[in-house]
Amino acid sequence: TEFDVTDGVHDVIEDTELPRRLKDEVLATAEERGVTKSQANEIATAVEAQYLDTRVDPLDPVGTVSAQSIGEPGTQMTMNTFHYAGVAEMDVTQGLPRLIELVDARKTPDTPVMEVYLEDEYAEERERAHEVVWKIEATKILALGDISTNVADMVVRIDLNEDTLQERWPRVDSTTQIAGEVAETIEGNLGVTVTQDGTILEFGPSEPSYRELLQLVEQLRDIVFKGIEEVSRVVIRREETERGEEFVLYTEGSAFKKALKIEGVDATRTSCNNIHEVHKTLGIEAAREAIINETMTTLEEQGLDDVNIRHLMLVADIMTNDGTIESIGRHGISGNKNSVLARAAFEVTVNHLLDAAIHGESDDLDGVIENVIVGKPVRLGTGDVDLRMGATQTSD
Amino acid sequence: MVDVSQHELVPEHTVLDEETLDGVLADYDIDRTELPKIKYKDPALPDNAEIGDVVEIVRDSRTTDEAVVYRLVIE
């Protein structure tokens, strides 16, 4: 096919039991070194033997191996890191706290962020990319102008900054028109009548009341005029990606579903570090992918990239097995084990034993922990194989 | 609306016909309830999938070229 090797060499390699990726790797090497058919045969046989030898054996305790393989490097991770690393001037939880947060399937991460990719026409120019920034970053009144309260006349006065208005609403020409929109938003949210004079807005409570006036100012500060409420900040960076140089946005705060719907956002590549949002928006399979990506990056950032990806894939498979994201731990996987003894061995021993006694539960002793507790051979590996003599006898 | 299936994190989901399914279950020697599950309201589920159906998911695997897995549609 795409490899420049003789048919003989090609067939020899194709006939092995290797998976596609390994076959391609062997083919590429054969092409590069220009091997003969007999050499190819030797290589293919050796690679195949090595491959078959390193496959997981039947009855191998893969879960235990994964637990150890993730747990050991975990001891080398920094206990508490809160730094500005990875993304420019942004605070992202890393290391052990992040790993714990992932396997615990915490509802919201400590520092939710989104990585927003842009569609071609927005990704090339900074100006266009900024248009998308203002559609995502929440714009509140304090960013738009100065608020002053006049207690004598019972009015709140807002002096809108023309430059800021023009910057955040690049598609509207006149600042008066933008100020009008702002006024409408305030009316809609606070239920007051706003009087507009150019870019100066004024309003007050219907009845003169000092308390109500202050309350209006409080509420005014919370109104989102543009963008997504959950996103407090957006950082724009020029990056080298597989599509060449392009602008990528990093957000502080996340609202994955809303972000994907925004015009200019590339809904095929944009991602979010909250696995629950990914689950809700893209489904369980995407959540599984996200768990693998997030755990692997967390380990890689700590220089622990030699953890085999298969261990993380197993963790993600287990966490997404029942169609929802389940945490690893007392409230998730371990807490739902069938065996009383296994659950009791994990956490809050007495409660589990007491509940089991009250409900008259029995234990089938199928798992590892139960058998260790009662001192029976564990039903794993050679422990799960029974040997029996053949029933037929041969006479001489 | 955003087309979820176009996202790079979402692998291809297709509903499996009964005949192929029987073959798969025989291969693994399991009952369909022993398969991993997928919720009926999952955004990536094809429109023609019903509760009790099995979807075939073809993942772009990290360890081999493609990995085919199955999920039973529930609830």
From Swiss-Prot, chain B:
Annotated coiled-coil segments of the chain: none
Enzyme class name: transferase
Record carries keyword Transcription: yes
A GO BP entry: DNA-templated transcription
Reactions mediated catalytically: RNA(n) + a ribonucleoside 5'-triphosphate = RNA(n+1) + diphosphate
Superkingdom, taxonomy of origin: Archaea
GO cellular component annotations of the record: cytoplasm; DNA-directed RNA polymerase complex
Location within or outside the cell: Cytoplasm
EC numbers, comma separated: 2.7.7.6
Keyword DNA-binding: no
Similarity-based family: Belongs to the archaeal Rpo5/eukaryotic RPB5 RNA polymerase subunit family.
UniProt function note: DNA-dependent RNA polymerase (RNAP) catalyzes the transcription of DNA into RNA using the four ribonucleoside triphosphates as substrates.
Protein name per the record: DNA-directed RNA polymerase subunit Rpo5
